[in-house]
Structure formats: structure tokens, C-alpha cells
A protein has these predicted regions:
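Helix C-cap/helix->beta junction micro-motif
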Residues: 66, 70, 178, 238-239, ...
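N-terminal small-domain helix-loop-helix segment of the aminotransferase-like
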Residues: 27-141, 149, 323-325, 343, ...
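Conserved glycine-rich beta-strand-loop-beta hairpin in the small C-terminal domain of fold type I
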Residues: 321, 337-345, 355-371, 400-404
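PLP-dependent enzyme catalytic core of the Aspartate aminotransferase-like
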Residues: 17-26, 121, 129, 377, ...
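Conserved core segment of the aminotransferase class I/II
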Residues: 22-24, 33-38, 42, 118, ...
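Conserved core of the PLP fold type I
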Residues: 100-234, 251-252, 258-264, 272
């Protein structure tokens, strides 16, 4: 504690140290005075000066070029990563009603109780998982915010978060913000798109605080099994880390019934599951989800959250209850995207791709071609993607994180099944003409 009788000397000492730090690196004359103040975690003095262009910005630029060069050619967009339909009418009508209720005007903080109770009902009905609505559930403003906050509960400088790659990087980004490190677990086809924990060394296990999983996996489409989750639980207990399972795509499971991590014995002792209403309920922009599982971890998340946001708008939470209580909504969405994936797989197989309907998610992840017959060769998936976009007006997302693969999304806009069929026919026409080499 700082002695109250010496505030001036303490302040001067801190200020002088701060000034020395701020002026230790010169800034350019054209820079604003605060260029030297940016935190190292976002680039420090070099913030905003990088010429690096990230993947999705490259895709946006390539799309603009394709539209400019071929204005009369239809752009086939398989790159969109969000649902193409609005939320169910029942949910939208509930939002309109709830927005007019005075009790929804204020801060929701870590409530309200009725949303948590609806989540408890949903988890019991869908997964046979019993949760205490008061202690084992809390809402989040979309799963992204939850994944950004959970590292604050556990990560100190030098700690490790294990993450699957390819995957959603948010928890890893925030791990680094707190001075931690990310250990990448490649998801390779030869391992069935599961991490190979046998390759993790003892020194990594010693420093690991969190393991972040994502099943059904985006973008590979693999789904978890009970045996896999059992292995994870045993490792968590042996090496003493917590498990965060990102279940954003869990309702888009196509092979068997959706499997929650919390259904597996022991899961509740070691971790939490993060759910989202975006994918499975067509509520992408509504930003509503929840964290559930171990009560102590949920409490830690709630404490961090309480210092980061004031809760999602009550009308959104109470409208979401209508979706949670209607099992027909995710069933209809799942049926639609499975149908589209089956059509896409059929189309791509006609063009040389070796692919199958994934276990889950609305993404199809498949090996990128190495080139076209008698023509170009591609060094990686990004080169293939840029070629498809700029030369053939087909937007496909590249993934070079663990092998060279392409990710097709079936969230394209199509008014009906006839429109879906027409789009698939055009896809086959364009790709077959290229004579792709694999």
C-alpha cells in the first residue's frame, strides 16, 4: 500500500519512470504524440504501420477486383461465414414485444434469471445435462466475448493456452494480451482432425492453464466423440488445466445427435462449455450466448464479465427464450444446411475434389488443388483462392494453417431449393472447365 503522507514523491517517481519509457523509442515527425504510447500487445510504437494484409482483407480486395473486371458475371460466394436467414418470426416478434416493456430498459449485468432458466431447460432437453441455473450458467454477449474474457480468469505471464489450429483465435489473442503464450495443436486429416496430445512435451504441460477446443470444429467440420472428451478430461486432471469447449456449431451436427462436452462424466469437474445462438438459431447479429459448466469457473467468468460489460439488452435475452424453448427452430436450420452440404459435396466431386459431408458446421473443408491442367500451379491454398476469386468469380476461403485446404461455406443466399440447384450447376460448369489437378 502507498503511504498517504507521501503522494507527491511517489507520483514524481512514477511519472519520471513513465516519461523515460515513453521517450525511449523515437517517433517519426508525422506521427501523433501518442504513437509511443500504444501497448506492445497491439504493436507498440509500430502500431498501424504494418503493410501486412490479412487473409480476409485480401479476399475483400479480390472480390472487388472480380466485380470490377467481370461486372456481368455472377459472383458465387462460398466465403460467407454467417447464416443467410433471419431469426425465426416468433423470436423477432418477441423482441418487438419485449423492447416495449419497462423492465427491459436497464442494465442486465449478470442476469436475468429467466434466461438462465431457459438455458437450463434447453441443456436438459437437448443434451440431458443438469445445470443449476443460478450457479452454473451465465449469459454472454456472443461467444466471442466469453472466449475473450476466460483467459483473464486463469492466465498470468508465462502461462500457456493450448488451442487447436485451424480454429478461432480469440482466446489465444487474449492469452497473449495477459503475457501468456499459445501452444498450437494442429488438426490434420491423418489424425482425423483431432489434436495429437502425444506430441506435447512435459514442459508444455507444466505451464498449460487452459485447453480451448471447438467441436464441431470450424473449419474442418469434425465432431467430437465421447472417447475423445474422456481423454481430454483425464489429461486435464493429470496435468491440472481447465477445458473451454467452444460449442458455437453444436446444433449443426449431421452424423449423430449433438454431443455436449458436459454429457461426459468428469467434464463438469474440469471445465465449461461456451454456447452461441448465432449458428443454430439464425441469430448472428443478436449477440447472445452463454457459458455453462463448473460453478467455480462460471463464477470467475461472471466476475470478469461484471467488469467488462453490463449485460446484453434484456429484450434480446427474453426474445431468445422463445428460441430456446422451440426445438423446431434448430431442427429446421440443421436440415437446410445438411441439404446444401450434400449438394455441394456432389458438385465438387464432379470436379475432382475428394470430400464428404462433414460431421458438423456449415463449412466444407477440403484439400486445395495444386493447379490447373496445362496451366498454373498453386504454392498454397491462398494462391488457389485468389485465382478462383479474381479469374472465375468464386469466393472460397483458404486455410494454410495445417496443410493447404479450402473452406466452402453453404451460407450463400438462395431463395429456394431451385436457386440452390442453379448455383450448384453453375459451380460445376466453372470448375469442370478448369481441369483441376490435385
Amino acid at each position: 500500500m502507498i503511504p498517504a503522507e507521501h503522494p507527491t514523491s511517489f507520483s514524481l517517481h512514477c511519472n519520471m519512470a513513465s516519461i523515460a519509457t515513453k521517450t525511449s523509442s523515437a517517433v517519426e515527425s508525422s506521427d501523433p504524440y501518442f504513437q509511443a504510447l500504444f501497448a506492445d500487445r497491439i504493436g507498440g510504437i509500430a502500431y498501424g504501420k504494418s503493410n501486412e494484409i490479412y487473409k480476409f482483407e485480401k479476399i475483400k480486395r479480390a472480390k472487388r477486383k472480380a466485380l470490377a473486371d467481370y461486372p456481368h458475371r455472377q459472383l458465387l460466394d462460398f466465403g460467407i461465414g454467417e447464416n443467410d436467414s433471419m431469426a425465426d418470426a416468433k423470436v423477432r416478434e418477441a423482441l418487438a414485444r419485449e423492447a416495449d416493456r419497462p423492465e427491459n430498459r436497464g442494465y442486465m449485468d449478470n442476469g436475468p434469471a429467466d434466461f438462465k432458466q431457459a438455458v437450463a431447460r434447453f441443456m436438459h432437453r437437448q443434451f440431458a445435462v443438469e445445470l443449476d441455473a443460478t450457479t452454473q450458467i451465465n449469459h454472454c454477449i456472443g461467444s466471442k466475448t466469453a472466449l475473450s474474457m476466460l483467459p483473464a480468469c486463469f492466465i498470468n505471464p508465462g502461462d500457456i493456452t493450448m488451442m487447436t489450429v485451424p480454429g478461432y483465435p480469440v482466446a489465444g489473442t487474449h492469452t497473449r494480451y495477459y503475457g501468456g503464450a499459445v501452444y498450437r495443436l494442429p488438426l490434420l486429416q491423418e489424425n482425423g482432425f483431432y489434436p495429437d496430445f502425444r506430441k506435447v512435451t512435459a514442459d508444455v504441460w507444466e505451464k498449460t492453464k487452459m485447453l480451448v477446443l471447438n467441436y464441431p470444429n470450424s473449419p474442418t467440420g469434425q465432431v467430437a466423440t465421447r472417447d475423445f472428451y474422456t481423454q481430454v478430461i483425464e489429461l486435464a486432471k493429470e496435468h491440472q488445466f481447465v477445458v473451454v469447449q467452444d460449442a458455437a456449431h453444436i446444433l449443426l451436427t449431421f452424423r449423430d445427435e449433438p454431443l455436449s462436452f458436459l454429457q461426459v462424466p468428469g467434464a463438469m469437474d474440469v471445465g465449461v462449455e461456451v454456447h452461441s445462438m448465432s449458428k443454430g438459431f439464425d441469430m448472428i447479429g443478436w449477440r447472445i450466448g452463454w457459458v455453462c459448466g463448473n460453478a467455480k469457473i462460471v463464477q470467475a467468468f461472471s466476475d470478469v464479465k461484471d467488469n467488462c460489460d453490463s449485460g446484453q439488452f434484456g429484450a434480446i435475452q427474453r426474445a431468445a427464450i422463445q428460441g430456446l424453448d422451440d426445438p423446431g427452430i434448430p431442427t429446421r436450420i440443421r436440415t437446410k444446411y445438411r441439404r446444401r452440404l450434400e449438394k455441394l459435396v456432389s458438385a465438387l466431386r464432379q470436379c475432382g475434389f475428394q470430400c464428404n459431408v462433414p460431421g458438423g458446421s456449415y463449412f466444407l473443408y477440403t484439400a486445395a488443388p495444386k493447379g490447373v491442367k496445362g496451366g498454373l500451379s498453386f504454392a498454397n491454398a491462398e494462391e488457389a483462392s485468389q485465382y478462383f476469386i479474381t479469374e472465375h468469380s468464386m469466393v472460397i476461403v483458404p486455410w494454410d494453417d495445417a496443410g493447404s485446404c479450402l473452406r466452402f461455406s453453404v451460407t450463400y443466399e438462395a431463395a429456394d431449393e431451385a436457386a440452390e440447384d442453379a448455383l450448384m450447376a453453375e459451380t460445376v460448369r466453372r470448375l469442370q472447365g478448369l481441369q483441376l489437378q490435385f
